[in-house]
Amino acid sequence: MFDPETLRTFISVAETGSFSKAAERLCKTTATTSYRIKLLEENTGVGLFFRTTRSVSLTAAGSHLLSQAKDWLAWLDSMPDELRQVNDGVERQVNIVVNNLLYSPQAVASLLSWLNARYPFTQFHFSRQIYMGVWDSLLYEGFSLAIGVTGTEPLANTFMLDPLGSVQWRFVMSADHPLAHVSGPLTEAQLRRFPAINIEDSARTLTKRVAWRLPGQKEIIVPDMETKIAAHLAGVGIGFVPQPLCQTLIDKNELVSCTIPTMRPPSPLSLAWHKFGGGKAVEDIVKLFTQRQPEIAGFLSIFNTVRC
């Protein structure tokens, strides 16, 4: 019923509004074109065109079929290439999760541009997660590869890891915050008076990591690092921020860095992927990272030193 030739004939008639013009476009006779449409209407049991002596126009059913037919034809036309790609060991879909600390729209766009040029028939899905939410996606939600899992050891022996670097932290507040000009290390009693600005761990199955907050201290949860830094600049609260993301603001005296009794140690992050079952696209992404190629440099800018 919906063979490619019939679909092409239907689309041509719909686009030209004429059996004769469609026939001319398809290098067919008008009678052949008209008969193919008549047969299609008989097989579907609905009228697809309103006919006048000078032109034809789509019925509601015809309009619906037109919107679908173009997609079907595109799918049929691309299928041979898709099958060859699958036969060559290329995945049909690759799901990639990125740690919030490493996420950058420009970095994702750069990697996507590189991937799309090489794997035009693979569907790529990117997700942005926080702390243990990155491992959660890899372990339980069908993700193929993670950029920035916490730690340098896998949570399961079915994964491979490549250390990317360690995030250095600074404890900051706005330049006009009451604690900004206190001399010497701040005490817990001083810190507890002001809210801690944090981003909540996005883990759904694994245990969430608890961000810095003193017992009895008010906590304000924000969705991402951009909002957290904006909240610090606005004087809303205090907390730890990755040093590369706040150093310029510190140098401009918009934020102040202070020492507290328990400073946050560096956070090591790694690339992680499944040992088994991966395809060529994942293999190529891993190579980009292990070889520190420029296509993935945007993901690594948060590290003070990037391994060469």
From Swiss-Prot:
Domain HTH lysR-type: 2-59
GO molecular function: DNA binding; DNA-binding transcription factor activity
Membrane-spanning segments: none
One of the Pfam families matching this protein, by short name: LysR_substrate
Keyword DNA-binding (UniProt): yes
Key word Flavoprotein present: no
UniProt xrefs under PROSITE patterns: HTH_LYSR
Segments of the chain annotated as binding DNA: 19-38
Keywords: Activator, DNA-binding, Transcription, Transcription regulation
Xref: InterPro entries: LTTR, LysR_subst-bd, Tscrpt_reg_HTH_LysR, WH-like_DNA-bd_sf, WH_DNA-bd_sf
Similarity comment text for this entry: Belongs to the LysR transcriptional regulatory family.
Protein task: Positive regulator essential for the expression of allD operon. Binds to the allD promoter.
Protein name: HTH-type transcriptional activator AllS
Species of the source: Salmonella typhi
